[in-house]
């Protein structure tokens, strides 16, 4: 078993670069299956989810070459083999293979999504869209079988009953090679959706409206190869900015797109965080007295649910009392008990998190229950006096590229220990 061991209380300063967006690349890689030639992605993060996707693509017959943060994928040898078990089950993003395999072969057998346990995240909206486009859906044990029964997918008018990033992306991918026009109403607006649409359009798709609540796709017969730069990871950027404010003595976070983080940065400014925002970076000064604030997550462009946990250790340094309410994922409170173990005045009451500060944290053995909870515990461990040992670190390595190396370069005393 691997653990992260942190000896906290060290002054952190310097520069940290944000990697490519995890939530983009986990959809970009499956979407490449639709191309009839080589696609190269630049800015690919070094995370375990990408390693799993590479293994899956190779198993299916794709040729994959890695060169630094570039990934060259030739999908021409891909076969529609059933994938009910194996690494596919560890990925939440496994559902993006539904749309890409349907679009290329008209059929798919893929294991049900895995990933972090954050409460109900149903795939009903995905299946509703596929059915509207002419696919049949059935369950085979722990796998999903989809088929067009030998017919091409047909364009459809699809209204998303709730805003869903995954369902919006999946529908967009499937519709790219469907016959006719597909309209997605009440579409999610996240930057990652624009990123996937950009790749598909560069491959020859006709998609407009990505980033708005109505997306229109005119299906095409063929998609070709291209080269694509993955957008910076706004969640990683926010995590490092919050970390810098909590424990830094002058940290510059680079490869940041401010427009993707406006609601997050606005909340930091409300707290009194001093920072300098430049074209593609944020410099965070050493902080003095911060003010407690309340946070309510909402779909983009609101405060991102994925940043609710990473900002929590920073909130614990503030003076006063505040609340956090996550309206997206009801079970995103598992970090609270772990932070309380470190001495934080924080609890869950009536479906929301209540905290009071300022707090002085002490090192303790803690467990990462999901990806973003793990990020919160890393920051808390860096803030705390003494040693913090984090278990279940595979969650953290799923989404934060080279996190140990990046933090060590800032002056942290942090390492992965094998047992």
From Swiss-Prot:
Keyword Cell division carried by entry: yes
Keyword field: Cell cycle, Cell division, Cell shape, Cell wall biogenesis/degradation, Cytoplasm, Peptidoglycan synthesis, Pyruvate, Transferase
First-listed, main subcellular location of the protein, grouped into a coarse class: cytoplasm
GO molecular function, one term: UDP-N-acetylglucosamine 1-carboxyvinyltransferase activity
Enzyme type, top EC level: transferase
CC annotations in GO: cytoplasm
Subcellular location(s) per record: Cytoplasm
2-(S-cysteinyl)pyruvic acid O-phosphothioketal sites (modified residues): 116
Pathway assigned in UniProt: Cell wall biogenesis; peptidoglycan biosynthesis
GO biological process, alphabetically ordered: cell division; cell wall organization; peptidoglycan biosynthetic process; regulation of cell shape; UDP-N-acetylgalactosamine biosynthetic process
Pfam families hit by this protein: EPSP_synthase
Residue positions of the active site: 116
EC annotation from Swiss-Prot or TrEMBL: 2.5.1.7
Reaction(s) this enzyme catalyzes, per UniProt: phosphoenolpyruvate + UDP-N-acetyl-alpha-D-glucosamine = UDP-N-acetyl-3-O-(1-carboxyvinyl)-alpha-D-glucosamine + phosphate
Residues binding phosphoenolpyruvate: 22-23
Protein residues bound to UDP-N-acetyl-alpha-D-glucosamine: 92, 121-125, 306, 328
Similarity comment: Belongs to the EPSP synthase family. MurA subfamily.
Function description: Cell wall formation. Adds enolpyruvyl to UDP-N-acetylglucosamine.
Protein name: UDP-N-acetylglucosamine 1-carboxyvinyltransferase 2
Organism name: Streptococcus mutans serotype c (strain ATCC 700610 / UA159)
Gene from which this protein is expressed: murA2
